[in-house]
Regions:
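Extended, well-ordered protein cores
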Residues: 217-219, 230
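Metal-dependent catalytic cores of enzymes that make or break cyclic nucleotides
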Residues: 188
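Membrane-embedded translocation segments of transport machinery
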Residues: 199-202
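Metal-cofactor-binding active-site regions of metalloenzymes
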Residues: 2-184, 204-208, 224-324
Length: 324
C-alpha cells in the first residue's frame, strides 16, 4: 500500500515499531543468577503515603506490569501471580512481550566460566570491571589482561566485549589487539568528546575491529558524524534520533535500556518506542509529500533494520570482515 497522507503514515510507522522484533544491546543483569520479579521491580517506586509514584522509572515499571498482565493496583497479588512462573518461563514471557530477537546481557569476565542462559535469545556481553586495568606494582600487564579476555570469551561464547570506563592505553595495548585476534566486537562508553576523539583514533588505526559506541547527549553528535564515514562503527543514539536519521539513515541503534532487571528492560522499551516512531514519521514525511512511493511494506523492513537488523547483520558479518 502506497502511503499518501500524514495520518496513514503515522499509523503505519507506529504499528511497525510496536510489532518489530528488537535487539537489546545492553542489559545489566545476571541472566543466570540475578534476582528478578515484581518485588524487585517495584522496590524503588512503591507509593509513599498513597501519593502517585513519579520516580524516573515508574512509568517503565508499570508499563512492564501492564504488558505482563499483572495488576498494577495490587502489588502483592502481582507478586503472587509472578511466583507461579518458573524462572525460565517468566523470563521467556518477558522476552516474548518485548518481541526480543536478541538480548545482550552483561557477563562479568570473572563469572564467564559459569555463565549459563535459560533462553537462546540471550547472548553474552563480556564486561570488564572498572578495576580491570588498574596498575599494579609494575604497571598494567596488558598481555595478561588480553589472555584473560580471550579465555573468558571462549568460556561463555561471547563475541562482544564491553568497556564501561574509557582508557586509551587499554584500548591501544589490549582491547584493540585482542578484538582483532579473537574477532570480538567492541562496545565502548564515551563520556566526553575528548574520549570519543581518542577512541576514533584507535579505531582508525585498526583495519578490522568493529565497534558499537555510545555516550550521553553531548557526545552523540560527534559519534554520529564519525559513523557517517566509518563502516565498522555503529553508534547508539538514544537522544539524538532525528540527527542520526538525517546523517546515518537507518544504520544506527536507537535504543538500549541499560536496565538492571528484565522487567525494567521490557518497560523501558515500551516507553522508548513511543519516542522512536514519531521521529521516524518526521523523517518519512518529506518523502511522502513529494510523491515518493512509500509503502507499508518498506516501512516495516526499515523499522526491522533499525531496531536490530543492522546490529545483527554486523554480528553475522564480523568474521567476513577479518578476511577483507
Amino acid at each position: 500500500m502506497v502511503i499518501s497522507d500524514k495520518q496513514t503514515l503515522r499509523r503505519c510507522v507506529k504499528q511497525a515499531v510496536r510489532r518489530a522484533a528488537v535487539v537489546e544491546t545492553l542489559l545489566n543483569f545476571d541472566a543466570a543468577r540475578g534476582e528478578m520479579g515484581i518485588k524487585a521491580l517495584t522496590t524503588s517506586i512503591s507509593k509513599a503515603q498513597g501519593l502517585t509514584p513519579l520516580q524516573a522509572d515508574a512509568a517503565a515499571a508499570f508499563a512492564a506490569m501492564d504488558a505482563l498482565e499483572m495488576p498494577i493496583e495490587d502489588i502483592p497479588r502481582a507478586a503472587l501471580i509472578q511466583s507461579g512462573y518458573t524462572r525460565e518461563a517468566y523470563l521467556r514471557e518477558i522476552l516474548d512481550q518485548m518481541r526480543a530477537k536478541r538480548v545482550f546481557a552483561c557477563v562479568s569476565i570473572r563469572d564467564a566460566q559459569s555463565a549459563v542462559f535459560e533462553d537462546d535469545r540471550i547472548a553474552p556481553l563480556l564486561t570488564l570491571p572498572e578495576d580491570f586495568f588498574a596498575p599494579g606494582r609494575y604497571g598494567v600487564e596488558y598481555a595478561r589482561r588480553a589472555e584473560e579476555i580471550h579465555l573468558a570469551a571462549q568460556q561463555c561464547g561471547a563475541r562482544d566485549v564491553l568497556i564501561r570506563q574509557f582508557d586509551e592505553d587499554a584500548l591501544r595495548f589490549c582491547l584493540i589487539p585482542v578484538c582483532e585476534d579473537e574477532r570480538l566486537r567492541l562496545h565502548v562508553r564515551l563520556d566526553t568528546c575528548a574520549q570519543a576523539d581518542g577512541f576514533l583514533r584507535q579505531l582508525d588505526a585498526s583495519h578490522t575491529v568493529r565497534a558499537l559506541a555510545f555516550g550521553d547527549e553531548t557526545v552523540e553528535p560527534m559519534l554520529i558524524e564519525a559513523a557517517a564515514t566509518r563502516r565498522r562503527l555503529l553508534v547508539r543514539a538514544n537522544k539524538r534520533i532525528p540527527l542520526a536519521l538525517e546523517k546515518l539513515g537507518l544504520r544506527f541503534v536507537p535504543y538500549a535500556s541499560e536496565a538492571d532487571l528484565p522487567e525494567q528492560m521490557l518497560g523501558r522499551w515500551i516507553t522508548a518506542r513511543e519516542a522512536i516512531w514519531p521521529a521516524l514519521c518526521d523523517a518519512y514525511l518529506p518523502l511522502a509529500r513529494c510523491g515518493y512511493p512509500l509503502t507499508s511494506e518498506a516501512i516495516a523492513r526499515d523499522v526491522q533494520a533499525l531496531l536490530g537488523g543492522h546490529f545483527l547483520m554486523d554480528d553475522d558479518n564480523t568474521h567476513e570482515a577479518y578476511q577483507e
